Amino acid sequence: MASGGREVPRVAIVCDWLTTYGGAEKVVKSIHELFPDAPIFTSQYSRKQINWFDDCQVYVGWVNIFPARLRKILAVPRALYFNHLHRKLRHYDTIITVCTAESKGTKLHPHQTGICYLQGPPTQYFWGMYDDYVKNPGFGKLNFIVRFFFKLLVGPLRKIDWKFAQRPTVLVANSSYSAAETEKYYNRSARVLFPPVEVDTFTLSSTDAVSEEEFFITTSRQVNWKRLDIAIQACLLSGKRLVLVGDGAEHGILQQLAGDSPLIRFIPRIDSPEELNALVSQAKGFIFPSIEPFGIAPIEALSAGVPVIALKQGGALDYIHEGKNGTFFDEQTVESLVAAMRRFESMTFHKQQVSASAKVFSDARFKQELQRIVDDATSK
């Protein structure tokens, strides 16, 4: 019982999948820390791939019989799973959903409040990034088969996705960009709550100077829509060093693009946040060429006192302030990025000020604001 005799609402957490270390998983982790007694319901869970939830009560759906690598083509099975999940949730009062895809479709019982945290714009392979997905589904030699069936099914799947988006009581978006896209495609307004970032882990370098060999950096999964090819080509044309941290389906293609140039360095993986901070904090600038719903990596760079050169679209508009903690380039082209890098060279940034601009995205701030949203929604 809560103070005043009011019962403490029983909370359940629902998410699409827990199969890797990513932004959505960080959000789930933070929410569970806020509500430690809440069980987690998800369609797929890979304990071998992610150990954040070893001590949590995780309930997995029948979709888990499929390999996690097939996640992209499991939209229909996931939709079926989440459409019937309410049968297992009847004893809970508040359902908090962290949604990238279909989990927002979880039905609510009349006594329940549903708060859906949208980890990005409406399911992107149905809506805003449909053309990119059709062009390259990411299945190599099987792309033509996936492309054929996806084109065949996307119409009905969009209708289901729209219907699912009407079910939560409250929608919460991870950026102003995501909120605008939510209104555009789902015809629903969403409150904006920036996701938690480990800003305390990424700190200023102990020295004021950057590395003796100045370099730019980007940390990202190496997939086609991240447009890391633009960053590589811009640095090659500008004669600037670039360090790329990460791996992915495009890794080999990006290596071919870089050739034997000593300007480009690849680091497939850095497991330790402290090691990553040590590297990032020595960079001259962080290059962010993709259209992201939010973008955790640029915030981490800012927290380390490193200014960001970002495409003037997506979530970056919420936290990059021209001339204060970075600069923008207008078009997703090599030429536009090169021009921004030249402009960047003439700018002066103060590391303390750059770092301070990231502190508003702390985990503590996220939990405090989410608790307020939950209290507001459940008090009505």
Task: Cite the ranges covered by each PLM segment.
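A charged, aromatic-enriched C-terminal amphipathic alpha-helix characteristic of glycosyltransferases
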Residues: 80, 332, 346-377
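Membrane-proximal helix-turn-helix segments that form the acceptor-binding/catalytic region
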Residues: 86, 137-171
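Acidic donor-binding loop of glycosyltransferase active sites
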Residues: 216, 281-293, 306
